Amino acid sequence: MTIPAALDLLLELPSQASSSSGSRTFSLPRLVGHLAYHAMMLEVHLTPKPGLVDTANNGAHRDMDLNTFIASAEAIAPYLHSFVSAGWESAGNPAAQLLSALRPIGIEAEQAMFAATQGVNTHKGMIFILGLICGSVGWLKANQLKIDAQHIGETIRQACQFLVIDELKAKRDCEPETAGERIYRQYGLTGARGEAASGLAMVMQHALPAYQACLTKGASTEQALWHTLLVLMANNNDSNLVSRGGLAGLHFVQEQAQQLLAKGGFLYQEIEQALTALDSVLIEKHLSPGGSADLLAATWLIYELVQLFKVRH
């Protein structure tokens, strides 16, 4: 498949009118939000993706398809800009207080998503992860700090350092248990909250280095994303998989991904056919690595942001 040509627009940096000094400026929220929106679109259009919605099929999902995801992404897009603005406006506060500024926007984004999808959860995890990245970039830029993977990860770590303690370990008898809380109680897995509290360790230590290495070796964006998705599937304790198939389902997917990586990943001549075959297996088993899909979009977004601000600095 061909990744949407709309990605070419990312090279056209959105700009405002010239300032009084004649120098051109750009809208940070619009630019970063634009990239985050395309991260969502890139993820869903990447085909094949084992167990996930793509242009070929609905994966292991019966309540959503490609059009559902597109409608959801379009509904969420304005809030991605707002995350950046909220981060910028929080510049006078420490990073540890950033989450409280982003959370109300995240709730509104979820409501917009559910309205666009008739109640289907297409992007809840994506809103959380991309919202943190967008907010962190706004905060870093306003504080005149370097925008690179290390600073983005550390800002998110500080913002979310108490998430696991406050929301998973704390017993809340008066509130209904969320899926993430149930999985933590049953298996001790911290899911998206734990990933955020770690400063996106899975992205920083596994996915981003893999993606960069693939590109260095001459992989196309599509090939690099396939390989990186396999790296995530092999290493990520994906709560989506645990929710659907327990630890056995998680370990099955991890082993399948490890086998394809052992064959060379994107360098394996039959990688596309192998991914298609694994897609069929995961659909039959009703397994969907949705958490890894969210982190794949986050990986691409962080990579593009780092490249962008290298140029702009």
From Swiss-Prot:
One of its GO terms (molecular function) is triphosphoribosyl-dephospho-CoA synthase activity. InterPro entries: CitG (IPR002736), TriPribosyl-deP-CoA_syn_CitG (IPR017551). GO terms for biological process: prosthetic group biosynthetic process. It is an enzyme of class 2 (transferase). Belongs to the CitG/MdcB family. It catalyses: 3'-dephospho-CoA + ATP = 2'-(5''-triphospho-alpha-D-ribosyl)-3'-dephospho-CoA + adenine. NCBIfam families: citrate_citG. This is Probable 2-(5''-triphosphoribosyl)-3'-dephosphocoenzyme-A synthase. Its EC number is 2.4.2.52. The keyword ATP-binding applies. The keyword Translocase does not apply. Keywords: ATP-binding, Nucleotide-binding, Transferase. It holds the Pfam family CitG.
